[in-house]
């Protein structure tokens, strides 16, 4: 079974639902659906959730004799959904026929194979009457059986009781995606639920930010639409012992009429609300007084800032702003003025490639203080190999590229803390430096580029031919047009579109160029090039020729690893203008096409294109290069003027 690192994403979307105890089934059916589910699991051992790229979801039991064809057939009968010319994917894996690799409670994605697809297919109502096609699950089902989800299980019971009593969830009006407060029978918020198909630019986004199918680049090109949910869960699972205080989080299949389902053709909201099932992140609601953007940072505990920063570095958080750091006042004797910090919203962590992270705490005075002995011990106890094994076990849909970023960042954190760097210094080494009109790789990325070059130069002496399949191009060909693969440079905040520092939606990027070229041309000549010219443009971090694209270009992995003939340009050229369509697919008023909203950003380092032996060599060389990089950073820090607030006492 072939692995496809760039195959469509493994998250779930809005779903047409079959009869359940809450959809009008008889009381007897409601009492027996759990028994039916138990008997089915005894015979098959596996329950999976199959969804289409536009949001329709169906839970089904797998028998030993089932294969990809039978799964597609069930989906076609149950949802009246066409399955011809489609692929069934499981994370990075494209399933051809055998389903033995699919684990219990796993989400699968059914995706059409057309090169140019619209996201206009509506979520159709089910028509199948056969018991085998019915989704007889309860209103909330947890995907996974980790002991870490025990708190979530109790929350689910409270919410289900409230749902049966008629307590309605409350939509969250802030943010760019769909989110809902689910309450207990007393009307108190218990959990915040974020359906994966209501993310920004996903098909059923309730706030007008539509235009993408599941698996296409989202707010960040390195985080695909529909995949933020399992990242939220990953952050919780990696926060061992609640070290950073991440609230309990799980991935669930949840059924309710409050969820949004857009008209698939025009993106309009239907007038009539119907019960739909969705895959969503399910996080414990934490009562708080305000968030970090509304409060001065001087009262924040050093330990809390350090612990949250350690987590952010491990998971390469690209969106740690003040709005997703909740602040809760601590009451009690001797607790005057003390607060507790709760980190939330980790959907943009663990990207598939390195890009520019955002750490709100990087200039806080607490971040400039040394780590405590306890914090250093915790960092040194981290084992990225065990972390990856755990995530593969609990979140089988997670991509290997995300796990490689986790390994890279954990090694970087361990080595940096052992060298004596503080949190602020580590964060600065991971953050890119912006100058007017250009963007340069971070110090971490520079080390990765050099390590990758070393591996490539070693491979030159033992060249080998690689068989390139169409699967390597799946992710790129899934995009409606070339514009879709440009990286976004958006911070996930409500006021982004009014306060974006690059107000024209575009920034000139530092660019990887060919080191051997016939002549150097100036920027104006580059802009005036004719259509016959073959410009080299940055797509993710690979060189990609537009002409080669039409000729079925060679492997992206080969091109991106061949860095021996490349160098970081001394001059920065303007980004090529993205291709535009004549008309957006979502033309209804109030809806914003994803292609119209995403500005361009660069990705200098891609880790997914290395084979296993190359990855091992890369990590060895990476660790060798860290010492000189840390020494350079220390020298630069000492030569700088003392940071404002460093002398504050806590």
UniProtKB/Swiss-Prot annotation:
Positions of ATP binding: 173-179, 194, 283-286, 345
PROSITE patterns the UniProt entry points to: PI3_4_KINASE_3 (PS50290)
Region (Activation loop), start-end ranges: 343-369
UniProt region (Catalytic loop), positions on chain: 316-324
Keyword Iron: no
Biased composition (Acidic residues): 516-529
Source species, domain of life: Eukaryota
Gene3D superfamilies for the chain: Phosphatidylinositol 3-kinase Catalytic Subunit, Chain A, domain 1 (3.10.20.90)
Record's compositionally biased regions (Polar residues): 560-569, 585-595
Gene Ontology biological process terms, A to Z: phosphatidylinositol phosphate biosynthetic process; protein autophosphorylation
Annotated catalysed reactions: a 1,2-diacyl-sn-glycero-3-phospho-(1D-myo-inositol) + ATP = a 1,2-diacyl-sn-glycero-3-phospho-(1D-myo-inositol 4-phosphate) + ADP + H(+)
GO molecular function: 1-phosphatidylinositol 4-kinase activity; ATP binding
Domain Ubiquitin-like: 46-103
Protein name: Phosphatidylinositol 4-kinase gamma 7
Source organism per UniProt: Arabidopsis thaliana
Taxonomy of the source species: Eukaryota, Viridiplantae, Streptophyta, Embryophyta, Tracheophyta
């Amino acid at each position: 079974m072939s692995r496809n690192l760039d195959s469509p994403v493994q998250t779930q979307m809005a779903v047409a639902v079959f009869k359940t105890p809450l959809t009008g089934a008889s009381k007897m059916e409601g009492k027996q659906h759990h028994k039916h589910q138990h008997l089915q699991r005894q015979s098959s051992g596996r329950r999976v959730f199959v969804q289409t790229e536009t949001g329709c979801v169906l839970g089904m039991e797998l028998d030993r004799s089932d294969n990809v064809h039978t799964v597609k057939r069930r989906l076609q009968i149950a949802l009246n959904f066409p399955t011809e010319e489609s692929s069934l994917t499981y994370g990075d894996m494209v399933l051809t026929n055998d389903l033995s690799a699919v684990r219990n409670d796993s989400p699968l994605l059914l995706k059409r194979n057309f090169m140019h697809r619209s996201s206009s297919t509506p979520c159709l109502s089910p028509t199948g009457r056969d018991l085998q096609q019915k989704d007889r699950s309860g209103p909330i089902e947890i995907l996974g059986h980790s002991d870490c989800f025990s708190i979530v299980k109790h929350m689910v019971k409270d919410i289900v009781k409230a749902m049966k009593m008629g307590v309605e969830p409350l939509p969250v009006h802030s943010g760019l995606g769909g989110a809902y407060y689910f309450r207990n029978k007393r009307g108190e918020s218990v959990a915040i639920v974020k359906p994966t198909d209501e993310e920004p630019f996903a098909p059923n986004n309730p706030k007008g930010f539509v235009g993408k199918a599941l698996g296409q680049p989202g707010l960040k090109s390195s985080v695909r639409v529909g995949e933020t949910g399992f990242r939220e869960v990953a952050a919780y699972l990696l926060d061992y012992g609640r070290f950073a205080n991440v609230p309990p989080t799980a991935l669930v299949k949840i059924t309710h009429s409050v969820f949004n389902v857009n008209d698939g053709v025009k993106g309009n909201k239907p007038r009539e609300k119907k019960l739909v099932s969705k895959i969503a992140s399910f996080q414990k609601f934490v009562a708080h007084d305000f968030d970090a953007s509304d409060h001065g940072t001087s009262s924040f505990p050093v330990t809390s800032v350090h612990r949250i920063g350690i987590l952010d570095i491990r998971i390469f958080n690209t969106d740690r702003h003040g709005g997703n750091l909740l602040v809760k006042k601590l009451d009690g004797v001797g607790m005057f003025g003390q607060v507790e910090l709760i980190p939330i919203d980790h959907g943009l962590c663990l990207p598939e490639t390195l890009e520019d992270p955002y750490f709100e705490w990087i200039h806080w005075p607490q971040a400039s203080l040394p780590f405590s002995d306890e914090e250093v011990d915790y960092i040194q106890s981290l084992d990225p190999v065990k972390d990856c094994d755990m995530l593969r076990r609990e979140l089988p849909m997670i991509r290997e590229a995300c796990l490689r970023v986790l390994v890279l960042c954990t090694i970087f954190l361990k080595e940096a803390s052992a060298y004596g760097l503080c949190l602020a210094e580590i964060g600065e080494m991971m953050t890119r430096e912006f100058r007017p009109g250009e963007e340069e790789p971070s110090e971490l990325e520079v080390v990765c580029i050099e390590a990758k070059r070393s591996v490539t130069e070693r491979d030159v002496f033992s060249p080998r031919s690689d068989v390139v399949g169409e699967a390597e191009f799946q992710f790129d060909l899934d995009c409606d047009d070339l514009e879709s693969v440009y990286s976004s440079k958006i911070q996930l905040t409500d006021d982004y579109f009014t306060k974006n520092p690059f107000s024209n939606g575009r920034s000139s990027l530092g660019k990887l160029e060919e080191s051997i070229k016939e002549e150097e041309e100036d920027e104006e000549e580059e802009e005036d090039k004719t259509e016959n010219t073959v410009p080299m443009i940055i797509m993710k971090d690979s060189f990609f020729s537009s002409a080669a694209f039409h000729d079925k270009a060679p492997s992206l992995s080969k091109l991106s690893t061949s860095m021996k003939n490349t160098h970081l340009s001394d001059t920065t050229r303007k980004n090529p203008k993205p291709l535009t369509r004549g008309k957006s697919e979502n033309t209804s008023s109030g809806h914003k096409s994803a292609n119209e909203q995403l500005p361009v950003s660069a990705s200098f380092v891609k880790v997914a294109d290395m084979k296993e032996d190359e990855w091992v060599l890369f990590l060895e060389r990476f660790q060798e290069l860290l010492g000189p990089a840390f020494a350079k950073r220390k020298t630069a820090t000492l030569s700088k003027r003392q940071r404002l607030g460093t002398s504050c006492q806590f």
